[in-house]
């Protein structure tokens, strides 16, 4: 029906051969709106008793463009579909189920522009079934060359979502690249493994995702490899695997001999050396190195000097550290170490005052969804708080918190903290209830508290 109407509206000079007619038919097929979508639009126009002029007025689409759409001389863009849907008073996405076919041309190959736009919109808005159907159709492509292009389209959308700050929406698309790309040594696959790790790094899936990233580092472009080294290093810091922190700090330093990445490599190197028993002098020298990179690193260096002094047993600097830190926005970074130092010194009243004074900072750490530094600092604080409760003779609450911190540490792969919790529990085991003993045994046997 649509083809006949289109042919009638077109004048031909001279005699039209079948070859010319077939050529015209193929051209029209490229732009022809699929029947189901066309009928849905017509249905709502009839319900509102609209003609094309009224649809143009209500949707904001120029009348000439409406005419080309209805005469199948122009494909329907997603932007125009949204405008038409809105003019009908429908919620966005109401007609998306009919748009899937518009993402493919007459040869049933994915149209680059429309498929990318539709895939992005569906992924961003959470239309899982729709984008799953689109991806499945794109992966059914028999031509290896075109299928490779389709995977590039999917990867492009994943990167746009990731760069737009909604990496969790991009995760299923990166999984598609990992599972479907035939070239296992391609940059797309390597980048997808890294993006997956970055997205899930704060969950119990992070450790598993990391193991795959380590095998893909050689296939990443330098810019992505720099980022990967940094986040791998940060993840090992979060899990307190200090030798691995040193390992990737050195790799990052070699790849980036100046600038921000260089500064971060030195910073993490200094933090790790403080934990593995290197000399205080060496750690302070490293801090001096990155203090001159920029004003930002100068501020970090000042705080890390105090932290290093405490790490090496010079606990008399704790009050000076607090005075320096208390008015800074990043107070949460040093607060757990100061609190634990007070507990170690049996300055329990000062520790209690610290909790009351900076309750808003402590609450923010606990509630933050930031999956790296604040979570790590919250874990550090909760461990110190459990020790504080035990030293304050609040054994039941203290041992409960120790078991919770041990459980969380084990789930994120922080075995160093896990062991510390179990050792602290053993120290106060005489005050444990049968429920505490049960949780302790479960953690030892299964790695889970319950």
Segments (PLM) and residue ranges:
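Structural register within alpha-helical repeat arrays
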Residues: 118, 134, 157, 191, ...
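Mid-protein regulatory/catalytic core that forms ligand/cofactor-binding pockets
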Residues: 140-268, 272
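DNA major-groove recognition helix of helix-turn-helix/homeodomain DNA-binding modules
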Residues: 79-95, 427-429
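Generic helix N-cap/helix-start motif at coil->alpha-helix transitions
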Residues: 29, 33, 77, 108-115, ...
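Recognition helix of helix-turn-helix/homeodomain-like DNA-binding domains
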Residues: 60-76, 100-104
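Helix-turn-helix repeat elements of alpha-solenoid scaffolds
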Residues: 121-135, 161-175, 198-213, 237-250, ...
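C-terminal non-catalytic interaction modules
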Residues: 1, 26-50, 378-450
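Solenoid-like repeat scaffolds
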Residues: 66, 102-107, 123, 137-147, ...
């Amino acid at each position: 029906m649509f083809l006949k109407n289109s042919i009638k509206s077109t004048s031909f000079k001279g005699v039209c051969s079948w070859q010319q007619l077939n050529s015209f038919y193929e051209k029209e097929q490229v732009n022809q709106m699929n029947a189901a979508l066309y009928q849905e639009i017509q249905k709502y126009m009839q319900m509102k008793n609209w003609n094309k002029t009224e649809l143009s007025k209500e949707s904001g689409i120029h009348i000439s463009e409406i005419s080309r759409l209805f005469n199948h001389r122009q494909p329907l863009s997603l932007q125009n579909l949204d405008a038409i849907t809105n003019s009908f008073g429908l919620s966005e996405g109401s007609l998306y189920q009919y748009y899937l076919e518009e993402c493919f041309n007459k040869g049933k190959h994915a149209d680059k522009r429309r498929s990318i736009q539709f895939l992005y919109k569906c992924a961003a808005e959470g239309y899982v079934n729709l984008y799953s159907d689109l991806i499945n159709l794109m992966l059914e492509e028999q031509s290896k060359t075109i299928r490779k292009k389709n995977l590039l389209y999917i990867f492009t959308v994943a990167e746009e979502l990731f760069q737009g700050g909604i990496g969790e929406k991009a995760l299923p698309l990166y999984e598609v690249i990992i599972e479907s790309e035939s070239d296992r040594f391609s940059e797309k696959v390597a980048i997808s493994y890294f993006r997956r790790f970055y997205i899930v790094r704060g969950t119990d899936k992070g450790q598993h995702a990391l193991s795959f990233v380590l095998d893909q580092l050689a296939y990443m472009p330098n810019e992505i490899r720099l980022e990967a080294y940094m986040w791998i290093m940060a993840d090992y810091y979060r899990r307190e695997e200090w030798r691995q922190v040193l390992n990737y700090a050195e790799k990052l330093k070699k790849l980036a001999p100046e600038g921000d990445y260089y500064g971060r490599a030195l910073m993490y190197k200094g933090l790790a050396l403080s934990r593995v028993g290197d000399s205080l002098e060496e750690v302070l020298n490293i801090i001096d190195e990155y203090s001159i990179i920029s004003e930002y690193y100068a501020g970090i260096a000042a705080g890390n000097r105090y932290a290093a002094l405490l790490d090496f047993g010079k606990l008399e600097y704790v009050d000076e550290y607090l005075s320096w830190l208390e008015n800074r926005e990043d107070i949460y970074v040093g607060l757990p170490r100061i609190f634990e130092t007070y507990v170690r010194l049996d300055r329990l009243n000062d520790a209690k005052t610290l909790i009351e004074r900076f309750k808003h900072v402590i609450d923010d750490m606990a509630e933050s969804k930031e999956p790296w530094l604040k979570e790590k600092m919250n874990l550090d604080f909760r461990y110190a708080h459990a020790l504080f409760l035990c030293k304050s003779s609040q054994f039941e609450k203290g041992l409960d918190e120790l078991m919770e911190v041990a459980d969380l540490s084990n789930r994120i792969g922080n075995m160093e903290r896990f062991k510390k919790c179990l050792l602290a529990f053993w120290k106060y085991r005489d005050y444990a209830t049968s429920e505490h003993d049960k949780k302790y045994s479960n953690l030892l046997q299964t790695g889970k508290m319950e």
